[in-house]
């Protein structure tokens, strides 16, 4: 079983440099997007009520801003 999976991996992925590069670039893009989204969500939750988007929404609700 393991040998068959290794052969498939080599035949379709590891054999050509272009597939390695495509996988590395795609993996980096997915990792960057995931980490950025998680960090931004965490930052927004820690600073809830202190960010301009929260202050502005409150001002609009009170009728102070447009």
From Swiss-Prot:
Component of the ubiquinol-cytochrome c oxidoreductase (cytochrome b-c1 complex, complex III, CIII), a multisubunit enzyme composed of 3 respiratory subunits cytochrome b, cytochrome c1 and Rieske protein, 2 core protein subunits, and additional low-molecular weight protein subunits. The complex exists as an obligatory dimer and forms supercomplexes (SCs) in the inner mitochondrial membrane with cytochrome c oxidase (complex IV, CIV). It comes from Dictyostelium discoideum (Social amoeba). This is Probable cytochrome b-c1 complex subunit 9. The chain crosses the membrane at residues 21-46. Component of the ubiquinol-cytochrome c oxidoreductase, a multisubunit transmembrane complex that is part of the mitochondrial electron transport chain which drives oxidative phosphorylation. It holds the Pfam family UCR_UQCRX_QCR9. The keyword Mitochondrion applies. InterPro entries: QCR9, QCR9_sf. GO terms for biological process: mitochondrial electron transport, ubiquinol to cytochrome c.
């Amino acid at each position: 079983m393991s040998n068959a999976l290794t052969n498939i991996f080599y035949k379709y992925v590891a054999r050509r440099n272009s597939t390695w590069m495509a996988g590395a670039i795609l993996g980096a893009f997915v990792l960057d997007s995931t980490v950025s989204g998680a960090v931004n969500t965490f930052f927004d939750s820690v600073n809830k009520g202190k960010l301009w988007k929260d202050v502005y929404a409150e001002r609009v609700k009170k009728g102070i801003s447009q």
